[in-house]
Amino acid sequence: MPVKKKPLKEDGFVFETTGGSVTDIDTSDMAGRSVSFDAHFITGKIMDFGKVLTGIPLYSYQEEIAYRIIYSVITFEGSVLTVLLSRQSGKSETMAFVIDTLTVLLPALAKIIPDLEQFSNGFRVGLFAPQSDQVVTTYSRAMTRLTSANAEMVLSDPDLLVSLESEVRLNLSNGSFLAGQVASKQSKIESKTYDLIIIEEAQDTDDFLVTKSIEPMLSATGGTLVKVGTTGITKNHFW
């Protein structure tokens, strides 16, 4: 069932977008797979699109995180990226920005950039966390941003024409989706394939589960694994 559209303001976007310029981000240490397009230029444009789509005002450190993830995805680095931030510093908001931006835009870019053909039928994101409420936090934020008036305006653009196909799940008409799963020791989570995986509260996620079940889900796609968390009390795959 299509999601009911919200009324739009006549004078443009509902949320004012703020933040610094992506040209201020240090990209000297980024080197992905050889692609035929200017990866940094495209990453910058994707970031600009995401700000309009979501209306999320990112701080400079959040922009650097989002930029690094997006660059890794479109260059098929196959990287494992670690995001270590304190509590209440905007981890979930940053991940929601990345999820919404890539699920909406990458299938459209795949039609005009041959290197991104892998995403022509949708961009697949897996979201994992040790407890269900931790999954819900990021999942719900991503859904909220995609049902905003800002997003409705962007999604209805003739060059995109993307819509949510559910009121409770992030499944888009372009084939993209966000799947949220609990990553506890008792979980059975094999047999899925993703282009991007995000592990929330990575410091509390079981080492064996990450190695045996989660990491192989990216092997066929050259996808990016993002481990997000804060400091823990034991040393594991996160630290």
Please state what every model-predicted region is.
Residues 2-239:
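Phosphate/NTP-binding elements of NTP-utilizing enzymes
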